[in-house]
Amino acid sequence: NDGERQIVYGWMSPFVEPIPMQNDGWCGNLTLPREITLGADGDLHTAPVAEMDGLRENTTDFGTISLGVNGEQTIADDAEAVEIEMTIDLNASTAERAGLKIHATEDGAYTYVAFDDQIGRVVIDRQAAAQGDRGYRTAPLSAEELASGELKLRVFVDRGCVEVYVNDGRQAMSSFSYASEGPRAIKLVAESGTLEIKSLKLHTMKSIGLE
């Protein structure tokens, strides 16, 4: 830090037993380092530090994507550590919920990162997660954000957790996500309607060497 930035870490720890990581001798983990800034709207914004871009390796640019009613498209067959940047066209989409199923395994388990149009919130839904807490997290969008007609999501996924940054850090959510054994796919989905994606990039992330 050069003294010009305010950087924080969050602490993630599960509180509902059984705790899957106990068997591996772990107890929680830190979030990504985040820079706190004051937005033009007067609110505090929190987004990953710029140095995170240096961990990107291979990038797949999907460009624009259109999904039909209840459509689904796999964007990664087996993802361990990835970053996803996507912009949803809210005006052109009709889905009640749409987003990403992460840690999607052959047994049908997954964690769902989605925009719920019925409540105007971005959600992390773990009801179908393979293990651990089935908790539900939400981040409300302001009237201004909803009226803008687009939603920007930056989603980080690794082996055991997910972090979601909404509209350049106006909201941030972190959650554990324990997958089943086997390949962990990422799927783009639309529920009860269509989905229009203005842009979507998937970056694989290299390790920082703490294994």
Regions found by a protein language model. Name each.
Residues 1-211:
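Beta-rich accessory regions
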